Amino acid sequence: MAKTVADVMTANPAVVRPKTALKEAIKLLAQKEISGLPVVDEAGKLVGVLSETDLMWQETGVDPPPYFIFLDSVIYLQNPTRYEKELHKALGQTVGEVMSAQPISITGDHSLKEAAQLMNKRKVRRLPVVDEANKVIGIITRGDIVRTMANE
């Protein structure tokens, strides 16, 4: 029988909250030697993901030309409100200010093939695994899938 996401995921992963200090989240990433964290609300429901890509905002010097390239994306300054939001994200000091909102997630009953296809399609390296109430119960990474394939 084919393995499911629940068979391979890391259960009870480290998580952070939107109000967690960014410095604290970075320390947690380093201690756990991981590249991303699910962000949950007080009820444990998934509200975002913090990744190394999100943290790259912190390393960017912001000099507002008519447009600028930020994390390989061209951001045009035709809309000053959007620029202000992007600048604020770049300089944010809490997880909530830097995280990727509207995260892509998966439930444990999906197949590994479905998880791999979703990661590839959405260009993500990890998927928070949620239950029917959208509470984080695990995390699955590309590495988890590759290691499972190698052991079969």
Go through each PLM region and give its residues.
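A periodicity- and composition-biased signal for non-globular, repetitive helical segments
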Residues: D131-E132, T148
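Short hydrophobic beta-strand motif reused across regulatory alpha/beta modules
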Residues: G48-S51, M56, G138-I145
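Bateman/CBS regulatory modules and CBS-like beta-alpha motifs in cytosolic regions of diverse proteins
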Residues: M1-L28, I34, V39-E42, L46-V47, ...
